[in-house]
From Swiss-Prot:
One of its GO terms (cellular component) is endoplasmic reticulum. InterPro entries: MPN, Npl4, NPL4_C, Ubiquitin-like_dom, Ubiquitin-like_domsf. Belongs to the NPL4 family. May be part of a complex that binds ubiquitinated proteins and that is necessary for the export of misfolded proteins from the ER to the cytoplasm, where they are degraded by the proteasome. SUPFAM superfamilies: Ubiquitin-like (SSF54236). GO terms for molecular function: ubiquitin binding; ubiquitin protein ligase binding. This is NPL4-like protein. Pathway: Protein degradation; proteasomal ubiquitin-dependent pathway. It is found in: Endoplasmic reticulum. Residues 130-279 form the MPN domain. The keyword Acetylation does not apply. It comes from Oryza sativa subsp. japonica (Rice). The keyword Ligase does not apply.
Length: 415
């Protein structure tokens, strides 16, 4: 039986020779040999929460005599491993002696050499305390990918919402899906500057801003010969570039994927991460390679110069090194999500606006238009500096919509 051992440093595969007779203690010894983490320093769990900064709630596999057969593990199951930052016993090789580089060279001290090294280390805690998603927005996004795309191609969207200044929690209240083209391994965003300006104006009027990225992973995505991976090199690059552009320390990246069980049933899972600060710095400094070839290992990100990662000099870094897990939850946001969503193939027709307004005739007008996707359609006919702020202020405060705006929206619906 092959088990996947996921830690903050990546994912390793462990082969258990006799799973029917093996115990937790046997697994720990196999991990010690393969991952080089001594048994006394290992903390094992079947709960991925073990890898979060606050992992107190994760139930540990604490009894070394417990048989693995009692844990309902199967081939390919994940076991989560936590250990202190410096627990791995493998150490970097001793440095070579340094000498003057000819008559023109300056003799380098060990301190000089260390100062010039780029060290890639794990970031233990995210700058975003937690990420909460509006249930309806998250469901509308994953439902489209599941029912219309069958998780065959990638899909992405920008997350908009609020950041709690005190707790550093992010609340995602709507998802904007820009024009895009997706394949199994790449989603290319065909960004429309004018449309994004309207999106940002609507968000600002609602007291919100762009707070992150969400993308799906296709079931047929490229595999790696070197092991499992959470994000591919292309996904790491795209997420890092957008986090660098995002401009807030709490920026979050969410992954939506379909996990197929042994019985063939599929469950949709949301996971949230931040790209580590060192990853963003490597991108900004031009160290992270941005040209990715079709033959490159998707599990590894290439560097343009040597870095020190995992105690050794390397030109490639395991993508999991750059991921900082973020606790995820859900909430009921202030907006509805019943209006057709933009950029999903066919343009949204004005008849959809009429149908939407007619369905909710029993509600106050401001409630009927409290949907981001509806506001985005209407905003194309409004002044972005005067009308959009005025209309979104009504939605934010749930106040009466001025008659002029109501007549305009109703006339658009009747067009």
């Amino acid at each position: 039986m092959i088990l996947r051992i996921r830690s903050r440093d990546g994912t390793d595969r462990i082969t258990v020779p006799d799973p029917a007779a093996a115990t937790v203690g046997d697994l720990q010894r196999l991990i010690a040999a393969r991952v080089t983490v001594p048994v006394p320093l290992q903390r094992l769990s079947l709960d991925p929460a073990l890898l979060l900064p606050s992992s107190a709630s994760a139930a540990l596999l604490a009894d070394p005599a417990a048989p693995l057969s009692s844990l309902r593990l199967s081939n390919g199951s994940f076991v989560y491993l936590s250990y202190p930052p410096d627990a791995r016993s493998s150490q970097p090789p001793p440095p070579k002696a340094l000498s003057a580089a000819g008559s023109f060279g300056k003799k380098m001290t060990m301190d000089d050499l260390i100062a010039r090294q780029i060290r890639v280390t794990r970031q233990e805690a995210p700058l975003c305390a937690a990420a909460s998603f509006d249930r309806d927005s998250a469901n509308a996004f994953q439902l489209h990918v599941a029912e219309s795309l069958a998780f065959a191609t990638k899909r992405a969207g920008f997350l908009y919402g609020r950041v709690d200044a005190d707790t550093k929690e992010v609340f995602v209240d709507f998802i904007y899906e820009p024009p895009q083209v997706g394949t199994e391994d790449v989603v290319q965003l065909m960004r429309d500057a004018q449309e994004e300006a309207r999106v940002d104006a609507i968000a600002h009027g609602l007291g919100m801003r762009r707070v992150g990225l969400v993308f799906t992973q296709a079931v047929g995505r490229k595999t790696s010969d070197t092991g499992e991976y959470t994000m591919s090199n292309r996904e790491v690059l795209q997420a890092t570039e957008l986090q660098a552009e995002g401009g807030i320390p709490e920026w979050v990246t969410a992954i939506v994927k379909l996990e197929v069980g042994d019985d063939g049933s599929g469950d949709v899972h949301f996971e949230a991460f931040q790209m580590s600060e060192i990853c963003v710095k490597l991108f900004k400094d031009g160290v992270l390679e941005t040209e990715i070839g079709d033959k490159d290992d998707p599990r590894l990100s290439k560097m343009r110069k040597e870095v020190v990662a995992g105690g050794k000099d390397t030109m490639e870094v395991d993508n999991d090194f750059f991921l900082v897990p973020v606790k995820i939850s859900d909430h009921q946001g202030p907006l509805s999500t019943g209006f057709p969503i933009e950029n999903r193939g066919n343009p949204v027709a004005m008849s959809a606006l009429k149908s939407h307004l007619d369905r909710a005739k029993h509600l106050p007008f401001v409630k009927r238009i409290s949907d981001f996707h509806l506001l985005l359609l209407v905003a194309a006919f409004l002044d972005i500096k005067a009308d959009v702020p005025a209309l979104t202020a009504c939605v934010k405060n749930q106040s009466v919509v001025p008659e002029g705006y109501q007549l305009l929206i109703e006339s658009l619906a009747g067009a």
